[in-house]
């Protein structure tokens, strides 16, 4: 990792977050070369023995999570003196940088390969990215044990070169443990995670994180994407428009081209997800189909994946050659049995993966996603 980043050179730094700094690496000997390159996250200081044990536990948890819209963890270097996490490099930048377009944001985008400032994201592009992140978050919540992200924000949603969205930085997530044989729906902690403006008042008051507090942060992210403004104080600043969603076009970012209908529906989702009283909040499972419907109405259809994106999601070293009963083709024939040993449900849509309906080299050459109507029971794009 030191060699791949030129000694963690400043010229290769593409970002900085709660875990530490992020550096661009073009190639790593132990991983298949990919055109997008790699992002190496390194802790600012040594983690120590206790921190190392916590990080090892976190890595084991994240290794069991696999979804097309969840940024995959490709490799780790865990040592008390320096801890590093390796991910694919998302050259489209973060949703936050693409929305705010500040001098610092544009500098980070230049480090990712943008020669000039990219145009503002359209409403359709924003909806598509938000939908992708919501899919990944809902997937984390359906795992057993459940994984809470606890740091959802526009800065933790990344874009690839084709405009697909990926939920990143699940490094602060914790697996919710079963108590007395029952699955718990929340997680209490003395440590407060999250960014200012995105943190649920429930967490600030009693430290109790849940699917609903993740949903609150997603609701704020929807509002950030709608307005193009920073999250801090945004909910109260938009209070009038949120009380009357049919006026939400008045707070919509002009450069995105939001329609009145899009702004109104997005405002209603914000209100549902970020309602002050927890008992009246909208579950993410209810909000996701409505986001799907917005994307479908906007015509924001995914581009066909290229050959590189058709590589196995687990080893990244062989083409996808196994198609599950649900329609997803995610793994090569060597890796598919390893995935099914952990769970007989498809990691992407949680539908039964068995029986395997197709195998062989031809799977990767076929169209790898099929859109379903939001009215269908399971709403996802099949990769």
Positions of the model-derived regions?
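A short, low-complexity linker immediately N-terminal to eukaryotic Hanks-type protein kinase catalytic domains
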Residues: 1-11
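Protein kinase glycine-rich loop
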Residues: 11-22
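Conserved N-lobe motifs of Hanks-type protein kinase catalytic domains
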Residues: 17, 65-68
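Catalytic-loop of the protein kinase fold
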Residues: 144-159
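RING-type zinc-finger domain of E3 ubiquitin ligases
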Residues: 306-365
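Protein kinase catalytic-loop region centered on the HRD/HxD motif
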Residues: 135-147
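Cytosolic eukaryotic protein kinase-like domains
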Residues: 27, 33-60, 71-127, 163, ...
């Amino acid at each position: 990792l030191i060699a791949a980043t030129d000694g963690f050179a400043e010229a290769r730094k593409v970002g900085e977050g709660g875990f530490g700094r992020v550096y661009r690496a073009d190639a790593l000997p132990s991983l298949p070369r990919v055109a997008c390159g790699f992002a190496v996250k390194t802790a600012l200081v040594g983690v120590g023995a206790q921190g190392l044990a916590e990080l090892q536990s976190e890595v084991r948890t994240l290794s069991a999570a696999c979804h097309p819209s969840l940024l995959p963890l490709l490799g780790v270097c865990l040592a008390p003196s320096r801890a590093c996490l390796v991910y694919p490099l998302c050259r489209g930048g973060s949703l936050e940088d693409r929305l705010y377009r500040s001098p610092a944001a544009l500098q980070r985008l230049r480090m990712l390969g943008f020669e000039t400032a990219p145009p503002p994201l359209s409403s359709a592009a924003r909806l598509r990215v938000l939908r992708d992140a919501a899919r990944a978050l809902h997937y984390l919540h359906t795992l057993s044990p459940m994984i809470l992200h606890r740091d959802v924000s526009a800065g933790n949603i990344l874009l690839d070169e084709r405009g697909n969205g990926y939920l990143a930085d699940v490094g602060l997530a914790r697996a919710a443990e079963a108590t007395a044989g029952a699955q718990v729906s929340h997680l209490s902690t003395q440590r407060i995670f999250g960014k200012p403006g995105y943190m649920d008042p429930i967490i600030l008051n009693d430290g109790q994180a849940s699917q609903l507090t993740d949903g609150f942060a997603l609701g704020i992210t929807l509002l950030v994407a709608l307005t193009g403004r920073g999250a801090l104080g945004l909910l109260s600043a938009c209070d009038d428009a949120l009380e009357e969603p049919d006026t939400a076009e008045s707070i919509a970012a002009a450069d995105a081209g939001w329609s009145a209908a899009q702004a109104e529906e997005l405002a209603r989702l914000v209100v549902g997800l970020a309602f002050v009283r927890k008992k009246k909040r909208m579950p993410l499972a209810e909000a996701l189909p409505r986001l799907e419907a917005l994307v479908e109405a906007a015509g924001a259809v995914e581009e066909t994946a290229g050959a590189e994106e058709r590589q196995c999601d687990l080893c990244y070293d062989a083409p996808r050659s196994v198609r599950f009963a649900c329609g997803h083709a995610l793994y090569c024939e060597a890796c598919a049995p390893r995935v099914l040993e952990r769970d007989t449900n498809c990691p992407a849509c949680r539908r039964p993966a068995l029986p395997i309906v197709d195998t062989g080299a031809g799977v990767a050459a076929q169209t790898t996603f099929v859109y379903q109507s939001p009215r269908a029971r399971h709403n996802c794009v099949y990769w």
